[in-house]
Amino acid sequence: MGSKERFHWQSHNVKQSGVDDMVLLSQITEDAIVRNLHKRFMDDYIFTYIGSVLISVNPFKQMPYFTDREIDLYQGAVQYEEPPHIYALTDNMYRNMLIDCENQCVIISGESGAGKTVAAKYIMGYISKVSGGGDKVQHVKDIILQSNPLLEAFGNAKTVRNNNSSRFGKYFEIQFSRGGEPDGGKISNFLLEKSRVVMQNENERNFHIYYQLLEGASQEQQQNLGIMSQDYYYYLNQSDTYKVEGTDDRSDFSETLSAMQVMGFRQACQQLVLQLVAGILHLGNISFCEEGNYARVESVDSLAFPAYLLGIDSGRLQEKLTSRKMDSKWGGRSESIDVTLNVEQAAYTRDALAKGLYARLFDFLVEAINRAMQKPQEEYSIGVLDIYGFEIFQKNGFEQFCINFVNEKLQQIFIELTLKAEQEEYVQEGIRWTPIEYFNNKIVCDLIENKLSPPGIMSVLDDVCATMHATGGGADQTLLQKLQAAVGTHEHFNSWSAGFVIHHYAGKVSYDVSGFCERNRDVLFSDLIELMQSSDQDFLRMLFPEKLNIDKKGRPSTAGSKIKKQANDLVSTLKKCTPHYIRCIKPNETKRPRDWEESRVKHQVEYLGLRENIRVRRAGFAYRRQFSKFLQRYAILTPETWPRWRGDERQGVQHLLRAVNMEPDQYQMGSTKVFVKNPESLFLLEEMRERKFDGFARTIQKAWRRHVAVRKYEEMREEASNILLNKKERRRNSINRNFVGNYLGLEERPELRQFLAKRERVDFADSVTKYDRRFKPIKRDLILTPKCVYVIGTEKVKRGPEKGLVREVLKKKLDIQALRGVSLSTRQDDFFILQEEAADTFLESIFKTEFVSLLCKRFEEAARRPLPLTFQDILQFRVKKKGWGGGGTRNVTFSAGQVNLAVLKAGGKTLTISLGDGLPKNSKPTRKGLAQGKPRRSAQAPTRAVPWASQGLNRNGATLFPRGEGPYTLEIYIWPQEFPEASTAIHLQPQDASRRPRARPPSEHSTEFLNVPDQGVAGMQRKRSIGQRPVPASRPKPQPRTHGPRCRALYQYIGQDVDELSFNVNEVIEILIEDSSGWWKGRLHGQEGLFPGNYVEKI
């Protein structure tokens, strides 16, 4: 079993594979670094930290930890909370940009094939996922993501070292609004390898788009573009390599076309782009032969198709490929001369035209992407630098020279900002520090780009190109001689017969000077520009906007000077941002997973300067910040600094650090900055800051939710009121109460939640009273969801290991659409009947208005029609047939009573309920009467004279008493301001004290026994004893037990429900409560329960 099967990469029990952060290595040597990287690589851990620098080893396979799950995991997480990951670095950049209001950039470096392009894709994908936004922002995100396949198709190719090598460099700026939404972007591209269009080395390919077009073109496109087999084209068959392992050119072509569409390319524009690509291929098939020392097109037929595709005359194409117009000056006069070319010059002209066409097409695509992402003004940005890696081939030419120069500049930035600048900053700020030695590659950069004293290689090259008009070997040999004279004694330069050697930071590279001057000139002859401007295609003419009739003064710019300027501009741009670094390592040359070449990796570790990086990081400080910036970021931690510190900034920083109890040895105060040593101390600050913001966010959220809830309650009350308006009397204490919905707290009641579907939303849940065929009250839990009504009861387990235990059981699950209607009376009672197909359900709930209103809403949503409601004072409900009889209907009659307490009287198949008058039927809730806060369930008043077990007791039989202070009198629970959900208890009009009615003598329906009794002297003594520690006393003698009223069983009775008492004949039962309904409560053998009063006689 492999390690991947035994351990999940993010489990807390994960296998420790080396160290996550190489600052923690016990030995700081190249060998120790390589061993740690190897150990992690073999266990599929491709990321490792050196402080904030991310080291990435190319696995050459798809890894499993780049899913949405990891995006959620790393979003907002502190760096060391989770294993090293590119998402952690990206999230850190994104959050710092928003918090510090500073532009960020990430510099991805490494040699060709080390995984830089893939890393850039993951960064863009993460940002796209975690940033919000509407349709416009989503469009920009799509452009950002789809620009990758488009630019890869036209700018990437297979090389000996990398199957998807970037043959151009790009700096991608993702621009953001102040809210962190990507709303724009900009791409800067550098030095496209144009020579690849016309020539490739062995085992290499041209740019991907050529192979995609030949493989994926439709039948119509093949006919229109003259598509043939790949080996037919000279620009493709030189290397005899057409396929790449693991690449599907046909599928990639579809992706490229899709990306074009996202960029806003219409179908006609896409066709013109592909037509130009095909035209370049056909142009390469024009060959030349010698005729009288001059070049002649070998086959005139080969001119027809490229001329057709480019929209030019085939005769003019032939003329411009075999001759050139040259301007000569004689004694102040200038004249144009047509010069006929030889075979070598004609082939050079053809290739120059092909390279020029492709380069301008590529620039057009980049500009089109930029236009699609353009925004009027820049706010914040994150830059991603994905540039060609350091390259060493068997034969290295001008392109490799430029590529390696740019990589040398990037290494210099890394050294400047992580090694050199850090140490210089400690000195400037007066921080105690031990200097660390490192190699500064500025000396190599100066060798290449110096202008004077001594001139660098590029300056010498430009000078040769300006003074030597000849092309070919003559100019190149002159270059070699001048280089020997100018920089021959430089310690990082050597020359040999055919070229020179530069000792780069990544090692020695031998360059062949053959073709250096030609490629550096990078001039497209004016004849060819005129030829393209004569095209009948607007698209092609747009690619050549030059005005040739205006004389150009000065020396034309060279490729070397352009790349030097671009490199220096790039450095300036990067230095304006807060930099982050990803150092990519290529583990092998085979491009196979789990293949590790020790010497190759060690060489990369050495030239990337990882050892020096670890030493500086260990000896230095993980975080440094200007006092003002530090105060701005962490001001929220103390009241004195929020919203801003009004005193000296240095003292403000010290106040913050003292407030969070940071140890003095964990930081140092410089002259303008504070330096924090360990990342853990920084994480402490960040965590406290997050908690503060979280607390404020919760406060705002709570206020907003309260506002929304109040508005929602008002709407629900209005809807409920409209259902009962002019049809049913209302209770004073319920008309203005809040609707809560879940009165049972189902989140903490798994025994009830088990009956519901997974993630089923609950609209209403409460304990209610159900009446059976004998009008016996039974406790039930009623739950309403968007689709069903659940009635849940309890039963005692009769067998098995849980015998005797009481368990919840599902008594009924009713589909809402199966309801036939709901019946209610016109009185102010709490009773309602759910009319079903087989048998009805007669229920009582003090929250009936809330339940019925929600039920009506859900029924209408499900059935697309209103729920039938019946309001009558004589109701019927059907009961299920049991055994030989017992089916049929039961009647419920409502009549006027003397008091507002419902009185129930059962007789045969009829239940009579009498109670006083309520508020008029046209009563509506008022805003003024809205009770604030959550209703207190324990303060509910009884609504009728029924056995205690079904209304005045909670689930375990204990009497419910109010939580409020003071005596529990009738005058308390009738006021809606105190107990908003009080039911139809005594109905009294609120009056002044002077107008209150005189006390009535107690009647058989008096509820004064519910009041809390007078505390008396015992209460006063109890209050005096609060806070005094009692003296331990001896155990008192047991008092003789006093007997209350008792009764003897005349018949045997077996309880039908868990709250009923079972007994045999002649057993004596202690009477606890006698109820006029005929159901008494008693105690027998230590158990309490209900029993029928007509089964016993008093003794």
Curated annotation (Swiss-Prot):
The modification Phosphoserine is found at residue 1025. Keywords: Actin-binding, ATP-binding, Calmodulin-binding, Motor protein, Myosin, Nucleotide-binding, Phosphoprotein, SH3 domain. ATP binds at residues 110-117. GO terms for biological process: defense response to Gram-positive bacterium; negative regulation of cell adhesion; neutrophil degranulation; neutrophil mediated immunity; neutrophil migration; positive regulation of neutrophil migration; regulation of actin cytoskeleton organization; regulation of innate immune response. Residues 17-690 form the Myosin motor domain. Expressed in liver, kidney, spleen, eye, brain, lung, small intestine, testis and cochlea. Barely detectable in heart. SMART domains: MYSc, SH3. Residues 728-917 form the TH1 domain. SUPFAM superfamilies: P-loop containing nucleoside triphosphate hydrolases, SH3-domain. Residues 579-589 are annotated as: Actin-binding. InterPro entries: Ie/If_SH3, Kinesin_motor_dom_sf, Myosin_head_motor_dom-like, Myosin_TH1, MYSc_Myo1, P-loop_NTPase, SH3-like_dom_sf, SH3_domain. Residues 916-945, 989-1045 are annotated as: Disordered. GO terms for cellular component: cortical actin cytoskeleton; filamentous actin; myosin complex. Myosins are actin-based motor molecules with ATPase activity. Unconventional myosins serve in intracellular movements. Their highly divergent tails are presumed to bind to membranous compartments, which would be moved relative to actin filaments. This is Unconventional myosin-If. It comes from Mus musculus.
